[in-house]
Structures are given as C-alpha cells and as structure tokens.
UniProtKB/Swiss-Prot annotation:
This is Ent-trachylobane synthase KSL2, chloroplastic. It is found in: Plastid, Chloroplast. The gene is KSL2. Pathway: Secondary metabolite biosynthesis; terpenoid biosynthesis. The lineage of its organism: Eukaryota, Viridiplantae, Streptophyta, Embryophyta, Tracheophyta. The Asp-Asp-Xaa-Xaa-Asp/Glu (DDXXD/E) motif is important for the catalytic activity, presumably through binding to Mg(2+).
Length: 778
C-alpha cells in the first residue's frame, strides 16, 4: 500500500572493498556476508579526530572586539589604555594590505574587514600610536568603502549602525577620512532611520538595541544598558559591548569580565565569550547533518546531558541568544529530552532578533518550530508562521549571500514534512562550507574544527553506505525474479522505490536486514493490494487468506489460480527467510507475529473488497478500525523491527507499541485518502473523505472534509513525533521507533504533492541520489 501512488522509474564506487557483481539469486544470509563493512579509517583516525573536536572547541580571536577592549582607558586616567597588551596585539597583527580581520581572502566578508579595520584604526588613533599603521588602515578603508553599501556582501550584526558611528568617532578624533561624502551621508541617514525604527518597534525589547550600543551615538543613559549585564559581568557575552559600557561607566564587573578574557586568550579576545554551549551544539548539529554522529554516540550523549543540565538551570548563554536557544531546543527535543517550547517565547516575533536580516538565526528558529509534539504549542506555531514567511522572501529576493546557508534554507523549506535525512545529508555535504566562517558583530571560526576532515569523512561514509544500498537493491531485484512476482500482469515495478523509501532515512550498515525486510514487504503488500482491488476474484481472495492461515499446512488446500500460487509462495518463502534471520537477533521464534500481521491485513482487505463489490457504504465507525489495518503497514514496519534490535515480548505487547502502529497507520490512511479521493472514486473504492461526505448527508462539503483531514494529519504527526522522541517510560527501542517516523516522512513524500517530489523526474533523481550516484567532491 505504501507504493501505490509512485510512478514507474551504475554505480562506480571508489571503495575497493566493494565489488560490482550482481547478487541475483543470493540468499539473505549470503548477502549479509558479502556486504559486511570492512574495518577502515572511518572507524579509526577520523573518529578520534571528531571526538577531539567534541571535547574542546576553540574560537578564533576578533580584531574588532580586541580594538574596543584596547580603547578602554585606565580607571584613574583617560590618557592610558587599561589593556595595553591588547593595543600591542593590534599593532602586531595588521595584514600587508592594511586591514585587520579573520578571513581576508573571502570575497563576501569585506564589510567585516572594514568594520574590524576601522575599529583598530580608532584604537591606535585614540592612543596616538602606530601612525604608519593608521595610514595603511585608512587606505584599506578608502579603497573598499564601496562594500559598505553593497547588499550582496555578508553583513556583521549591527553593521549599518556601528560602522557609520565609527566614522563619526574617527572624525571627532581628527582622522583624515577621505571618503565619498554623499556615500557617508547616506550611511548616516540610514543609521539614523534604522535607529528610530528600532527604538519604535523594539521599545518592549530594548536588549536588541543594547547589543549594538557602541553604535548608538544618541545613547545617553548607559545605566539603562547595564540592566542587561549578565552574572559574568558582560553585556550579552560580547567583549565589544562590554568594553563600550566600561568606557562610559567604569563598571567593576565589566572590568573583571574583560580582564579575565585578556588573561585567558592572551591579549586578543573572541567576538563572544563564553561560547562553550553553542560551540558544542554547532559541532553536534554539523555531525548530525553530515550523517556521521553515530560514530561518536557516547560522546554525543554525554555532551547532550551536560547541555540539558544547563537548559534546566536557565543558562544565560542558551536563553539569551536565539540561535543557541533554537538549536539547543531542537537537538535536545529530537534526542528525547523533555523540554518545553515556552522557552522560545522571547523569539516568537521577527523583531526579537538582534539583527533583522539574520537568516541563520531565523533558520534555526524555523527548524525548532518543526518539532511540535503537543497539540497546543502556540509559541512554535507563531515562530513557524513568521520564520517561514521571512525565509521564503529571502530566497525569492536572493538576499542570502552565503551559498551553504542558502542551500540549507532552500532544502528546509522544500521538505517540511518529507524530510528524508539521507537527502538532507547529501545536500549538506555537497554544499558544505569548509571555510567554517560565521558572523556576529565580527566573523569567527572554530579553530580546531577541521571542516575539510569532516567533509572527507562524511562523503566517504555516504558513498560506503550507498554501496551497501546498491548491493541490497541487486539482491532485491534477484528476489523479485526468484519469487516470480514479476510474472503478474498487474504487478507494478516498485522495488527501486521500496528500497529507496527506507534507505533514504535508515541508512546505517547494521540495519541492512531491516531495510531488506521493509522493501520486500512494501512490494508484496502493494501487489496483494492490487490483487484484492481488481486482480482476483472473491474465490481467489478467500483462497489466499486460507493458505496464509494454514501456513505450513497449505498443501492440503490447493491453489485456485496461478496468481494465488505465486502470491502465497512469495509471502510464505519471504516471511520464513525473514523469521529465520530474526530468530538469531531476537533469541526466540517470532514467525507467528509476522504471519499474524499478514492475516490481519488480508482480512481487512477482504472486508473492503466486499464493501466495494457489493456497493456497501460502511459507517465511519466500521471503516476506520478496518481501514488503518488495510493500509498495510503491519507487514512492512512490524516485521522489519524484529531485524533491527532485540525487541522483547513486553515491548511487542505494550500499549506504546500498539499505539505507534495505530497512529502511523491512521496517519497513512488519512494522507492516502486525502490525495486519492478522485482515483478511488473512479475505481469504486471508498475512503475517509468520500465516506465523511456521504455520511454527512449534505451537512459537510468535500472541501470542509479535506480541511478537517489536514488538521487531523497534523495532529497525528505531532503525536507520532512525541512518541518517537520520548524516552521516559518508553520500552520500545529508539532504533525501532525511528522506523515509524521514517514511514511518516516517506508517506508525505509519496502522497503529498507539495514537498518537492511530485514529478517522476524529481522522484527518480531522489532515488539515484540515495542509491545509485556516489558523491563526487570537486
């Protein structure tokens, strides 16, 4: 049933361990021996490097923030710098072209270089030192001032307010700034208009303005700014903001904060501190998006436990920053930690961001809004509304200059419900930003996070897993011929889609048996569904059910047709093979469970066939309990779970297990029936939409039913994600629960036309991306 709406559809692996010979006719046991993953560097040196990245993340220094620290005078005199070693660092770190900054070669970071360079020039001019350096710095600013108004340049937070103000500071100091006067006036006008606008719109959120206080030339009450001083003495963990406050107020706690930074980092300071939580979230998020986090599972879990403790303690580092808060919320919730979305209430409006055009923060908030697990989470609903609108506009207008971020936003918006992680991994790998440069008020990077290593690691791992998927598909194509189901006239060629549907999310090598089971039963249930719809007579349908009920004693019954014989033997031999394999993993025989799932399915399909052929209109109370079983996810999902991880009888008989199956089955039935209303009607089949209209007797229209079904789909999807994510009180293994969530994403992919794969061409491209085409990096 899973594949009923799909359209009909050479690998040259670089790994020498893989052969390209066909596996047609091989047994499942032989296949598993052939595709065993060899020990390699993937589990050796690279894993050690990733663990090192997780254990300690180092941040680059910021010329911009160091310059502001260098401008702070001693507390008893305005003629001497309080941090002379920071001033010395500036004098020793000018680049040959006269600039200061992190990434001088990046063509889109010229605004950042302008800001850092002018700040350093101001520091030198203030203390009347390094005049030659000042002249070289001014030459750089004058030569590159065009970038200050270039909308295609990546802009540091608050640049349009801070940079013009620094020009004014420079003039007041007597700097000879030979800049285009009309351009400077335009920047000053834009700053003033932006300041007025923000004062008006952010009167209830003054912290956003205080973050860029060094750029507010009209700010008279610095004591108001100090309301946002944190327990560590800083303003927003920003050395530049804290230094600006210390210049005006001589606050002791500000001094202690900056003094500790210069001691810790050796005279030059980073653009944000502390940054431990965000840095670790950044690395975890990168590993997840690259598909390699499984190699450091224990380290990741330990780190998430630490982050969760910080969350529960109300860490300022988390809750004061939208990017950090959104990322922490999403990663913690999807990894099973019980946290409330109310923590994101401060970011439920666009104006809550420090910087209006902060696409990175907006994307993180949008992703967080996708993790709704309760029926009433208004904060996430509000965040989803404004972030999706904003990001869609940014894409249309082409105003996201960072190529990697642009690709990530584009993927996130196009695959809201059909987010198949392997496609996300591939997109992220192919668009990965190896420069590892991010922007706050200045650019920064994590010095010991080697993005090139991560990229190499991830693309090798992707291609290795893909090689296994290709071998699995070879085996499945041989199985089709061996079973003879390719001889059935009405049997659609769905094996590629079946293999893709599971490999696109459950890709890990150790789950190969589970993937093969999923694909085999997806094909079998689709063919059986067609047989019950129009391929077989009632006598043949009853015959097939009796054969399955007898199982090993089926020879006493006989076959009513060749089609029945082929179908039964395919179900019989495949289920027996899978049960033998499952027995090894489970330590007990689970064949009866597998057979029962087929019996329940066939009886439900027979009931629907009787309704259709006898033109009976059932009540909704009769249709739904039967309809969720007839959607055929029992053999597909439940059988596969026995080949994933040990699954106790307690878990199989639990309310949690039954509810997972029921919720995903109802979800599938709703998604299918919402889309297939017209096609089902043409075939004389009833579904939830048409039944609701018929039983409503004119009181409800089809459009109203469609809207009702859409709301129910959303409700069930939230409930499913809650059950899959929760860990407290759960006895079903997480790896098994992931199969239910994978099915939800696959159903949206196959049945919904608004997630990017509605055309055969796009679907084929997705199949090839996961199974056939290795990643080739430039």
């Amino acid at each position: 049933m899973l594949l009923t709406c799909t359209n009909s559809l050479k690998i040259s692996s670089q790994a020498k361990e893989w052969e390209s010979k066909t596996l047609t006719g091989m047994s499942l046991e032989q296949l598993n021996k052939r595709i065993r993953i060899p020990a390699s560097d993937i589990e050796g040196t690279m894993t050690s490097r990733v663990k090192e990245m997780l254990s300690k993340v180092e941040l680059s220094v910021s010329s911009y923030d160091t310059a502001w620290v260098a401008m702070v005078p001693t507390l008893d005199s305005s003629k001497q710098p309080l941090f002379p070693k920071s001033l010395k660092w500036i004098m020793e770190n000018q680049q040959p072209d006269g600039s200061w900054g992190l990434d001088l070669s990046h063509p889109l970071l010229i605004k950042d270089s302008l800001s850092s360079t002018l700040a350093c020039v101001l520091a030198l001019q203030k203390w009347n030192v390094g005049q030659q350096l000042v002249h070289k710095g001014l030459d750089f600013v004058q030569s590159n001032i065009w970038a200050a108004t270039d909308e295609h340049q990546r802009s540091p937070i608050g640049f349009d307010m801070i940079f013009p103000s620094m020009i004014e500071y420079g003039r007041d100091m007597g700097l000879n700034l030979s800049l285009n006067q009309s351009l400077v006036e335009a920047m000053l006008l834009k700053r003033d208009l932006e300041t007025k606008r923000l004062f008006y719109y952010l009167k209830d959120k003054p912290s956003n303005l205080a973050y860029v206080a060094e750029g507010l030339n009209t700010l008279n009450d610095w004591k108001e700014v100090m309301k946002f001083q944190r327990s560590n003495g800083s303003l927003f963990n920003s050395p530049s903001s804290t230094a600006a406050a210390l210049i005006h107020l001589h606050d002791g706690k500000c001094f202690e904060y900056l003094n500790s930074l210069t001691k810790k980092f050796g005279n030059a300071v980073p653009t944000i501190y502390p940054f431990d939580i965000y840095a670790r979230l950044f690395v975890i998020d990168s590993l997840e998006k690259l598909g390699i986090d499984r190699y450091v599972r224990e380290d990741k879990e330990k780190m998430l436990d630490d982050i969760y403790r910080c969350w529960m303690q109300g860490s300022e580092e988390i809750f004061s920053d939208p990017t950090c808060c959104a990322m922490a919320f999403r990663i913690l919730r999807t990894n099973g930690y019980a946290i409330s979305s109310d923590a994101l209430a401060n970011f439920d409006e666009k104006e809550s961001l420090f910087y209006e055009k902060d696409a990175k923060s907006t994307l993180e908030l949008f992703k967080a809004s996708q993790t709704t697990i309760f029926q009433d989470e208004p904060v996430l609903d509000k965040i989803n509304a404004w972030t999706s609108t904003y990001l869609e506009k940014e894409l249309r207008d082409g105003t996201i200059p960072d190529k990697s971020l642009h690709a990530e936003v584009d993927y996130a918006l196009k695959h809201i419900q059909a987010n198949l992680v392997r496609l996300e991994h591939r997109s992220y790998i192919e668009n990965y930003n190896v420069d590892n440069v991010s922007l706050l008020k200045a650019s920064y990077r994590f010095c010991n996070v080697d993005n090139r290593d991560l990229l190499t690691f991830s693309f090798q791992d992707y291609n290795m897993c893909q090689s296994m998927h290709r071998k699995e598909l070879d085996y499945l194509e041989g199985w089709i011929k061996k079973c003879g189901i390719d001889q059935l006239e009405y049997a659609r060629q769905t094996i590629k889609y079946a293999a893709f549907s599971i490999a696109s999310s459950i890709f890990q090598p150790k789950f190969s048996d589970g993937r093969i089971s999923w694909a085999q039963n997806s094909v079998l249930t689709t063919i059986v569904d067609d047989f019950f719809d129009y391929g077989g007579s009632m006598e043949e349908l009853v015959n097939l059910i009796e054969l399955v009920q007898r199982w090993d004693d089926h020879t006493t019954i006989g076959y009513k047709s060749k089609e029945v014989e082929i179908l039964f033997n395919a179900v019989y031999s495949t289920t027996n093979d899978l049960a033998d394999k499952a027995r090894i993993l489970q330590g007990r025989c689970v064949k009866k469970h597998m057979i029962d799932s087929w019996i329940f399915l066939l009886k439900a399909m027979l009931k629907e066939a009787e309704w259709a052929r006898n033109k009976i209109v059932p009540t909704m109370d009769d249709f739904i309990p039967n309809g969720y079983i007839s959607f055929a996810l029992g053999p597909i999902i439940l059988t596969s779970l026995y080949l994933v991880e040990p699954l106790s009888e307690e878990a199989v008989n639990s309310e949690e297990y039954e509810k997972l199956y029921m919720v995903i089955s109802i979800l599938g039935r709703l998604i299918n029936d919402r889309v297939a209303t017209q096609s089902d009607g043409a075939q004389g089949k009833l579904n939830i939409v048409t039944l609701e209209v018929i039983n409503g007797k004119g009181a409800i229209t089809e459009e109203e039913v469609q809207e009702k079904v859409a709301r129910t789909i959303d409700s069930n999807r939230r409930e499913l994600l809650r059950m899959v994510s929760q860990t407290e009180g759960s006895i079903v293994p997480k790896a098994c629960k992931d199969f239910f969530w994978t099915m939800s994403n696959v159903l949206h992919l196959f049945y919904m036309g608004d997630d990017g794969y509605s055309s055969p061409t796009k679907m084929m491209s997705a199949v090839n991306a996961v199974i056939n085409e290795p990643i080739v990096l430039p």
